[in-house]
Design a protein with these regions (language model features):
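Intrinsically disordered, low-complexity regions
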Residues: 33-36, 57, 97-100, 110, ...
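Acidic surface patches and DE-rich sequence motifs
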Residues: 20, 103, 135
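Amphipathic alpha-helical interaction segments
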Residues: 47, 69, 105-106, 180, ...
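Intrinsically disordered, low-complexity segments enriched in small/polar residues
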Residues: 14, 23, 110, 120, ...
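Glycine-rich, aromatic-bearing surface loops/beta-hairpins
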Residues: 122-199
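Long, low-complexity intrinsically disordered regions
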Residues: 62-130
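Context-gated lysine
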Residues: 3-6, 19, 51, 58, ...
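Short N-terminal edge-element motif at the start of the domain
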Residues: 1-62
Length: 199
C-alpha cells in the first residue's frame, strides 16, 4: 500500500491505518491540530468492513507533534471506523520542569521528571503541576499511565513500543527507559499483574 504524503494528514478527527511491521497494523486518530491518539487495537491486515468504535477503544497514548513525523508509517485514511470524540488527554510527563526550579534555586536542583496537567491543551507552556517530582517506587502508576507531551527523535520509537506491547503486554519504550532507568521489566511485570488481579 502507498504511504501517505505529509499533506494528506491534515484533517482533524481523521482516522488512519498505521503499519507497525509487515504483519502488524493498528489505528491512529488525528485530534485537535497536532494531537495523535494511538489505540489498543491491532490486526495482521485491515478489512474495510471491520466495525470499530474508537469511543469504546482504549487509548494507549497521545502525542503532539507535526504530521510529517508520522508520514512513513501512516498507510491510508479509514472512513469505516467511528472516530473518538472523548476529551483529549491533559495529563503528561514533563521532564524539564526541574530546569525552571534549578534557575529559581541558583542551580542546585537534581534532575527529575514531573507530571503536569495542561490548562490550555493548545499551548505547551500553560500547565499546572500535579506531582512535582515523580518517585519511581511510589508513583509507578502515574509513570506507567502517562507519557511525554511531544516526541523527540523519529517515529521508529513508536513502532518499537507498539510492537513490544503486542508481544509482552507492557507499554514501555526507549523514552521512559531513559527517563526512569531504575524501573526494570520485572517491576513493570509485577505492576501489570497486580493491576490485572485487582480488576
Amino acid at each position: 500500500m502507498l504511504k501517505l504524503k505529509k499533506d494528506f494528514i491534515d484533517t482533524i478527527d481523521s482516522v488512519y491505518l498505521i503499519k507497525i511491521t509487515d504483519d502488524l497494523y493498528s489505528i491512529c486518530e488525528h485530534r485537535g491540530n497536532t494531537f495523535f491518539e494511538f489505540f489498543d487495537v491491532f490486526f495482521p491486515d485491515f478489512n474495510e468492513e471491520r466495525k470499530i468504535d474508537l469511543n469504546e477503544t482504549k487509548i494507549l497514548f497521545t502525542k503532539s507533534c507535526a504530521a510529517d513525523r508520522f508520514k512513513d508509517f501512516f498507510v491510508k485514511e479509514i472512513t469505516s471506523v467511528i472516530p473518538n470524540s472523548r476529551a483529549i488527554e491533559t495529563i503528561y510527563l514533563q521532564p524539564f520542569y526541574y530546569l525552571l526550579k534549578r534557575l529559581q534555586n541558583g542551580g542546585d536542583v537534581n534532575q527529575y521528571v514531573s507530571s503536569v496537567k495542561r490548562t490550555n491543551i493548545y499551548k505547551s507552556v500553560d500547565y499546572e503541576i500535579v506531582i512535582e517530582q515523580l518517585n519511581e517506587q511510589n508513583n509507578l502508576q502515574e509513570i506507567y499511565k502517562y507519557n511525554s507531551f511531544g516526541m523527540v527523535g523519529s517515529a521508529d520509537k513508536i513502532h518499537e513500543e507498539l510492537s513490544n506491547y503486542v508481544k509482552t503486554g507492557i507499554l514501555w519504550g526507549r523514552e521512559k527507559s531513559t527517563l526512569f532507568p531504575t524501573i526494570s521489566m520485572e517491576m513493570l511485570q509485577n505492576y501489570i499483574l497486580q493491576t490485572t488481579n485487582s480488576l
